[in-house]
């Protein structure tokens, strides 16, 4: 019995020792655990190496997987940065558009920019004068087919770049965002619009006739339609500009100032009296072409005002009453006294005021009534006076 117990104890002890050795072996072997942990890291490295050939030289260290991943990500970022620096965008639209525009179109944009500065913009501005950017974009989209291939933002930036260019033909921005063509030979500080009014030199162009010392004036003959020279009266040197204007106007000639850059062109055109388009060559207005359809007097600017005729009629009406009642003293209208003061009735107030005062009450308004209204009020006042007198 004791022998059997001893064998059982030995078997149990041997089994326990084997189990203990197997457990110790599993605990004391950390390489297996590290290899399991390094499996996903190695798979990530292999995926990155397959995407970019520049990671083939990465050295993987199985003992320190995290340091290899950090070194690989750093090399990948530097490679991407170097790739971006190899293809810069040097177009005139700015560096912020390098992602939206390929580098192969740089030459095309530079050629479009040259065409804008040298050909299209000078032609448009010399034809239409000062224009805003939106109008320039419209004209360029019609004239330049390659300009329509750009987006609206790129078109605006390219046009702004061309307008602000300091080489070759130069342009200048004036009030309210409008651009004009400026001669490249004239410096920027000598432009007439950039100088104050008191600093503008009082010099006249050589081809522009002067008002004080001119011997001949240009006029246009309506009969033959050709420009002929007509002699003007000699003006004394000591005479002022206003006196010279009066002298020329008294002789039946219209005067004008030659302050525009196209004065030499308009000097050969006749200034028709009473025409609102005299500066365009004396084109007659509709009222001047058919004067029989219109009544009344025309002012110097050729515009007909009906209110002026009504005011003249009203003044004539008041003048007639003033002549008829010239002995009456001037009446001062007091609204408070007329409405609240005194115990007399309205009829007695009308008698005290009189017809002249009632008519003057109408004249106290800011806007004068028409002739018909004044006549109607006059008849009403006279009727009330007659009724009050009969009572």
Swiss-Prot record:
Record localization: Cytoplasm
Gene Ontology MF annotations: DNA-binding transcription activator activity, RNA polymerase II-specific; sequence-specific DNA binding; transcription cis-regulatory region binding
Biased composition (Polar residues): 189-201, 209-229
Keyword Endoplasmic reticulum on entry: no
Bias (Basic and acidic residues): 16-29
Recorded superkingdom: Eukaryota
Record keywords: Cytoplasm, Phosphoprotein
InterPro entries assigned: Stb3
Post-translational modification Phosphoserine, affected residues: 194, 199
Region: Disordered, residue numbers: 1-29, 85-105, 189-253
The keyword Cytoplasm appears for this protein: yes
This protein's GO CC annotations: cytosol; nucleus
Residue ranges, compositional bias (Low complexity): 90-105
UniProt GO BP: positive regulation of transcription by RNA polymerase II
Family per record: Belongs to the STB3 family.
This protein's name: Protein STB3 homolog
Origin species: Schizosaccharomyces pombe (strain 972 / ATCC 24843)
